[in-house]
Amino acid sequence: MNSLKIPDFLIFSTISSVFHSKENLMNTTAKFHLTAAAFGVLIASSVYAETNQVYSNTVQAHNAPMTVIMKDGKIANILTDNRESPGVGKLAIANLSKKIIRNQTINVDNVTGASVTSMALKYAVKKNLEAAGADLSKFQTKLPKAQLKDTYSSEVVIVGGGGAGLAAAASVIEAGGTAIIVEKLGYLGGSTVVSGGGYNAVDPERQNRQNIDDSIDRHFQDTMRGGHNKNNPELVKKLVEEAPPTMHWLEGKGLGFGPKVRVIVGGLYPRGHGAEGGGYGYIRVLEKFIKAYPDKVKVFTDTQAVKLIKNEAGKVIGVLGKHDSKDVNFMASKGVIIATGCYGSNEEMRKAFAPYSLHADAQIYFPTKSNTGDAHIMAMQAGGVMQKNDNHAATVHLEAGAGSYGFLHVNANGERFMNEDVNTQSKSCSKELQPHGIAWTVYDSNWTQDVKKQVDGNLAGGLFYGQMWQPWGNGWNVEIEKASQAQHIKDGKVVVADTL
């Protein structure tokens, strides 16, 4: 089957706004703006009624302006023009809105993995009902749980509904088989859906247009060097050889890649391709393909895989899942594919297998509820063993603080301690060894022009630079970077020389 490797990447920004309405009580149109925050709580300010009503509430959730329309005392529609994470918050809002309208109740379960957005939506609808003078008790009907059978069977059972799991399911379809996807979150996409969507592959057609000389062997050597030659050469060889055809396979499914090639975040050489729609682009095209074959693939969300089922001979023949506290057997006649994420949110496993990762100051990538190492644990319980390395590879970088750029790095004693053009991992690990685990980047008033040269010229050894939210194919925005730096100065992450 084809392989799919997608780096996980997303940083959320914060947007503040309020709710407002200008209609009468029983035919109310209230527009709500859900405020972005890393950790969400619901905060309501004063609500008051006048002839031309205005309701002011603040909800900390994710970016989602929405309009709730009341008609004849009922919820008629919930309109959204939101800036939610594609495939996560947007999907949560769409699914919950349909349930609320269809059943005329706000007593619906949150979408697993999008709890903050789910709570914010229900809170917004509740405030609108109150504003309309509705009897809230009439909108509290508890919906019955969907009942699953004890056993489901297919040729292949896939644990995990992220990018890898959906790619596996699409490959099963193309091979003429049937599959079941078991996903513990309330939506498909996993970490891939909130990733930056960058894809490393040798692609002469695009690279030649930018006079970039590249080869499969060079990609192999760069990847080995990035892993300090601790990588498994056979796996790296397969990765770099399969990357181009898999990229074209995705294009055949409808995924577009921008024409400009650049150094991917943390990379060493300009062979990074940006997927249209970022990480959600992968999920969108793969999910669309799979949905076209409902007789081939069945998807079970909100279903936790808890154990691999083995026969008397010790062969894995299925997966024991749990859905709403009910045990469900998913049997596979031809095999089980484990396609889950990492264990970055499992502190016990990180202590055991990647203790260096515990030194990081922040975790900014994957949804914290998804990457908890469940499948790793299942596999070990079934007799599998973890890779025997001194430390499992963790993506650790400098950007929990201010942007590091490609400038002179010194420690707290003012001493230069490394070659600044090494890869991102080496920079980060070197910084951790310095006094207090802190490094400073030194640059002058021409820094914006210099950073632009780094970005445009694919320089700086794979440093994080430019805007993390910068769409692939768009230029580096000086004004955004200046605004970001102004905030860093306020936060004390950047110090201006003449203020010392």
What is the role of each PLM region?
Residues 107, 111, 178, 187, ...:
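Conserved N-terminal/central alpha/beta ligand/cofactor-binding core
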Residues 376, 385-500:
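An anion/pyrophosphate-binding glycine-rich loop and adjacent beta-alpha core
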Residues 325-326, 331-397:
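Glycine-rich loop(s) and the adjacent beta-strand/alpha-helix scaffold that form part
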Residues 147-164, 180:
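Beta1/beta-strand and adjacent pyrophosphate-binding region of the FAD-binding site
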Residues 309-330:
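Conserved beta-strand-loop-beta-strand element in the redox core of flavoprotein oxidoreductases
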Residues 50-143:
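Active-site- and interface-proximal helix/loop "cap" or "latch" segments in soluble metabolic
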Residues 15, 19, 25-48:
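Gram-negative bacterial Sec-dependent N-terminal signal peptides
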Residues 138-153, 414:
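A short, basic/flexible loop-to-alpha-helix module at the beginning of a structural domain
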